[in-house]
């Protein structure tokens, strides 16, 4: 196994297993934390600023069984395909490939019509979802923000590695495009969560009360995301 530092330097672990581990150095961290990057499908190790190589290597070796077991359990990556049924902004639709159509990608009631060659279908569906999300997520977020007397500076749709959303101190909100594939109540929860950060840049009791005021079923949405979120990352 090879560990790659932020500096670009690498060093080998004794029992090489042919995979890379990303290392993130954090000045605010006092302990080592290991997790799996769902998008890149690699282990990520967060270490304190002055962590030694030996300590990092020992920690990885001690958790080797967990790393291999967790990687093995990751679902296979998925491509959008003709005839596939997906949830799209809370509606069940069927992806329908029509090579000779001249529509690009369009939604026709419960069918998502995709034109062009089959080799472009996955990319076209993904691009459509991201473009549509800009409007759908913007409208819902602005509506929720108005309810708590806040304004959003900017909303962006991202292809993030692990986060479903984020809200900066400048009132800029980012959303992961994959959340469009979740049930509507999950989308509602995430929007309420990030919009609440406009008022509370923490996860205090006041923050969760704000979330609850915007979405009474927020716990249902959060539970679904915690349990099923990894499945959404099979789409890349």
Describe these PLM feature segments.
Residues 1-188, 198-236:
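Active-site-proximal or metal-binding-adjacent scaffold patches in catalytic folds
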Residues 191:
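Walker B beta-strand of ABC/ABC-like P-loop ATPase nucleotide-binding domains
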Residues 194:
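Walker B catalytic acidic pair
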């Amino acid at each position: 196994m090879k560990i790659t530092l932020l500096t670009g330097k690498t060093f080998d672990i004794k029992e090489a297993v042919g995979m890379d581990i990303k290392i993130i150095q954090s000045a605010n961290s006092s302990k080592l934390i290991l997790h799996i990057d769902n998008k890149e499908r690699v282990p990520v190790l967060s270490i304190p600023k002055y962590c030694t190589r030996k300590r990092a290597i020992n920690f990885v070796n001690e958790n080797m069984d967990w790393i291999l077991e967790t990687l093995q359990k990751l679902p296979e990556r998925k491509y959008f395909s003709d005839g596939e049924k997906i949830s799209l902004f809370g509606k069940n639709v069927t992806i329908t490939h029509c090579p000779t159509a001249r529509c690009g990608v369009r939604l026709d009631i419960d069918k998502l019509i995709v034109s062009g060659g089959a080799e472009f279908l996955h990319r076209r569906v993904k691009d459509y979802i991201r473009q549509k999300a800009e409007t759908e997520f913007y409208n819902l977020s602005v509506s929720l923000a108005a309810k708590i007397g806040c304004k959003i500076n900017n909303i962006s749709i991202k292809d993030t590695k692990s986060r479903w959303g984020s809200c900066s101190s400048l009132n800029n909100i980012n959303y992961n495009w994959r959340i469009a594939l979740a049930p509507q109540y999950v989308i509602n929860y995430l929007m309420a969560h990030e919009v609440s950060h406009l008022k509370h840049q923490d996860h205090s009791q006041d923050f969760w009360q704000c979330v609850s005021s915007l979405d009474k079923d927020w716990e249902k949405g959060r539970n679904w995301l915690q349990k099923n979120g990894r499945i959404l990352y099979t789409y890349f």
